């Protein structure tokens, strides 16, 4: 307790000097913290994240062609099966789609179309309302079908999750908001009726229980809403739904061998020119190429600042110990053991390191967060890179405790206790 009290007294003895040392260390640590956070957030593997964190999404480019006769179900069951049979593939999820109309009715359809025209159209809804009422086939939209796993993922992202059984049974659906200024409360609970585009007599009514802003679930974006339902319900309702896209997840993330095998399947397919894909690996490669030497430059800046901060601390503490040689020698002469003396110096170092990190993790983190959000155009969640942070904590505490200890060990060799008290060289 006495040693701890002496360390604290020395730490608070010269507030101005202590503040300068703490701020110097905290500034270096804060810049380090800021740079490693930015580098981690902009790393290719952090930026790149396909929907559901899949490794590849294969798209059927014919699915959204304007003329229905030009659309072909090229992502058929046999092709998807060949993907599933690949040893490196862990999950495959296909999204199906059918073109629909949403017949006019005075409640939800009317509200939706009014808002759609107000938001996106240059002409008033009143000018085209009659056409919509009498010829809904001129206002096509999409019915999207997703499997149970994709539903679970989507449902977890909703502000108001929906009943799974209602969704799978076909009682409930989710609607894509399409950027309209309609709240969940405006939409949820209303009924929406859709009819097959090629057969207006075949219709189905859903209760809207959820609303999403995720544009992954879109095909032909028409004026009426895009409806998302269970794929089994869509298959029962529609005559020939088309597979719009297939997402693939590998057992091993960023597995280039598996990806090459999938791409080989695409190239061998007779419809190769009608496929497109999004690849996490390709996106990461593009980002790394675009970033060039940015990570190395950032690390270089971090090392320079760390060196400056450490040298500043060393210089300050060496001078501090030198100026206290007489005081420390007197303590040693009246019975303080070398172990106790070194323990006191170590505690002082811990106080400096702890104080610097306190400033870094409050003020420094606040500044880092503000800078991060100002440049966060991709909407990546703020997170602290734990390993670089723990590394910096370890190094800073090691330096802050070892510098005073080594300084004392070197300086005490300059003479006996009596000589040091008298100030003899």
What are these regions (language model features)?
Residues 284, 288-291, 340-344, 353-419:
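Short helix-loop junctions at transmembrane helix boundaries
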Residues 1-22, 384-388, 406-425:
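Feature of multi-pass inner-membrane transport and sensor proteins
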Residues 3-8, 12, 19, 280-290, ...:
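Alpha-helical membrane-protein architecture signal
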Residues 15-41:
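Short, strongly hydrophobic transmembrane alpha-helices
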Residues 21-31, 295-315, 352-360, 391-392, ...:
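Alpha-helical transmembrane segments of integral membrane proteins
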Residues 36-50, 317-320, 373, 407-415:
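Sec-dependent signal peptide cleavage junction
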Residues 40-298:
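Basic-flanked hydrophobic alpha-helices used for secretion and membrane insertion
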Residues 309-351:
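Interfacial "coupling" helices/loops that link adjacent transmembrane helices in transporter permeases
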């Amino acid at each position: 307790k006495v040693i701890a009290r002496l360390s604290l007294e020395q730490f608070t003895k010269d507030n101005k000097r202590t503040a300068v040392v703490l701020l110097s260390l905290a500034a270096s640590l804060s810049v380090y913290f800021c740079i490693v956070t930015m580098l981690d957030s902009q790393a290719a593997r952090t930026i790149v994240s396909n929907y559901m964190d899949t490794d590849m999404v294969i798209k059927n480019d014919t699915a959204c062609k304007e003329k229905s006769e030009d659309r072909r179900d090229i992502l058929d069951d046999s092709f998807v099966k060949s993907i599933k049979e690949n040893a490196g593939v862990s999950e495959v999820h296909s999204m199906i789609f059918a073109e629909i109309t949403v017949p006019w009715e005075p409640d939800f359809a009317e509200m939706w179309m009014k808002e759609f025209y107000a938001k996106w159209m240059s002409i008033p809804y009143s000018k085209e309302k009659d056409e919509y009422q009498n010829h809904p086939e001129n206002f096509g939209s999409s019915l999207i079908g997703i499997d149970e796993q994709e539903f679970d993922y989507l449902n977890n992202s909703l502000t108001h999750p929906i009943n799974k059984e209602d969704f799978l049974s076909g009682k409930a659906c989710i609607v894509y908001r399409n950027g309209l200024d309609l709240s969940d409360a405006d939409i949820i609970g209303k009924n929406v009726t859709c009819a097959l585009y090629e057969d207006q007599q075949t219709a189905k009514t859903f209760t809207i229980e959820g609303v999403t802003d995720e544009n992954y679930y879109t095909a032909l974006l028409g004026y009426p809403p895009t409806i998302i339902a269970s794929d089994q319900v869509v298959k029962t309702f529609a005559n020939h739904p088309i597979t719009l896209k297939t997402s693939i997840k590998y057992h091993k993330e960023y597995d280039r061998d598996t990806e090459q095998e999938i791409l080989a399947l695409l190239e061998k397919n007779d419809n190769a020119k009608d496929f497109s894909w999004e690849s996490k690996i390709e996106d990461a490669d593009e980002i790394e190429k675009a970033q060039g030497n940015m990570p190395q430059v950032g690390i270089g800046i971090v090392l320079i600042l760390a060196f400056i901060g450490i040298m500043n601390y060393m210089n300050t503490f060496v001078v501090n110990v030198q100026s206290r040689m007489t005081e420390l020698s007197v303590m040693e002469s009246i019975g303080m053991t070398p172990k106790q003396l070194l323990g006191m110096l170590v505690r002082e170092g811990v106080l400096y390191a702890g104080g610097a990190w306190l400033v870094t993790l409050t003020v420094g983190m606040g500044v880092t967060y503000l800078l991060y959000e100002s440049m966060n155009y991709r909407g990546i969640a703020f997170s602290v890179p734990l390993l670089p942070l723990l590394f910096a904590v370890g190094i800073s505490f090691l330096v802050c405790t070892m510098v005073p200890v080594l300084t004392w060990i070197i300086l005490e060799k300059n003479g006996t206790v009596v000589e040091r008290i008298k100030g003899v060289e």
